[in-house]
């Protein structure tokens, strides 16, 4: 049922004739604007490889290259399914100061809020579980409900996916755009380090 839900959702996205756009929302960035290396990560919050990167590789990347001014890092949503869409909605409804902390928590506890049993209520139960994480960051039940119905945030998330496909031919997550060059799949710190040193 989950595979059918994902396939139907993706088909519906690409049935849209025009790109969505948002003037006020954007991917979240960290690092110096003057950094010689720019890394954009297209990721999915339900992707296990994205969680692995976030939990295992990103902390060292941040301490050795982002905090030292070598890398500017940007996160862009690439929703793979309806659960992903709701998770990204929650993330972008959080205060900007809480964005990276909530992002980290969702990846750390990914297996807890993706509720696969019973199989006929995956979306409903996972969406409810996400709301519990929102409360930890001051997002009330009413705020969360409003967030899920926020068209501007929905449009932004969908546009990022469509633009990622059209501009970079992205078909899987994570995908990294490093100074304009595309690298698909999860990357270890050692792999990224080699690329960064070549481009810096």
Name each model feature, range by range:
Residues 79-172, 177-181, 186-190, 197-200:
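Cysteine-centric redox/oxidoreductase cores and disulfide-bonded domains
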Residues 1-85, 131, 135, 154-167, ...:
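Extracytoplasmic thiol/disulfide redox context detector
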């Amino acid at each position: 049922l989950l595979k059918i839900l994902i396939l139907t959702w993706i088909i519906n996205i690409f049935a849209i004739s025009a790109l969505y756009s948002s003037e006020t929302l954007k991917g979240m960035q960290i690092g110096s604007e003057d950094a010689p290396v720019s890394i954009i990560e297209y990721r999915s919050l339900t992707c296990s490889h994205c969680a692995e990167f976030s939990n295992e590789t990103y902390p060292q990347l941040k301490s050795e290259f982002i905090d030292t001014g070598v890398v500017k890092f940007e996160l862009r949503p690439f929703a793979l399914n309806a659960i992903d869409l709701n998770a990204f909605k929650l993330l972008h409804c959080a205060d900007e100061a809480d964005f990276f902390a909530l992002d980290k928590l969702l990846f750390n506890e990914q297996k807890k809020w993706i509720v696969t049993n019973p199989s006929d209520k995956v979306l409903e139960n996972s969406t409810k579980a996400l709301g519990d994480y929102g409360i930890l960051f001051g997002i009330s039940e009413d705020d969360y409900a409003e967030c899920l119905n926020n068209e501007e945030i929905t449009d932004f998330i969908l546009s990022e996916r469509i633009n990622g496909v059209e501009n970079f031919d992205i078909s899987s997550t994570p995908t990294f755009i490093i100074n304009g060059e595309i690298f698909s799949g999860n990357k270890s710190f050692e792999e990224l380090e080699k690329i960064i040193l070549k481009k810096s």
